Amino acid sequence: MQVLSSLKTAKQRHRDCQIVRRRGKVYVICKSNPRFKSRQR
């Protein structure tokens, strides 16, 4: 999982990527291609 300062490009890497807020952090999850998972500080 990458830790990025901005998730704008991370959500556009794959069309299945979606942004989720969990416990005050912002995550990008991608079920079809999990290598695109990322988290914002």
From Swiss-Prot:
Q: Which GO terms describe its cellular component?
A: ribonucleoprotein complex; ribosome
One Pfam family name from the record?
Ribosomal_L36
Q: Which UniProt keywords apply?
A: Ribonucleoprotein, Ribosomal protein
InterPro entries assigned to the protein according to its UniProt record, in alphabetical order: Ribosomal_bL36, Ribosomal_bL36_sp, Ribosomal_L36_bact
Does the record bear Transmembrane in its keywords? no
Highest taxon above the source species = Bacteria
Q: Which NCBIfam families match?
A: PRK00831.1, rpmJ_bact
Report the protein name in the record: Large ribosomal subunit protein bL36
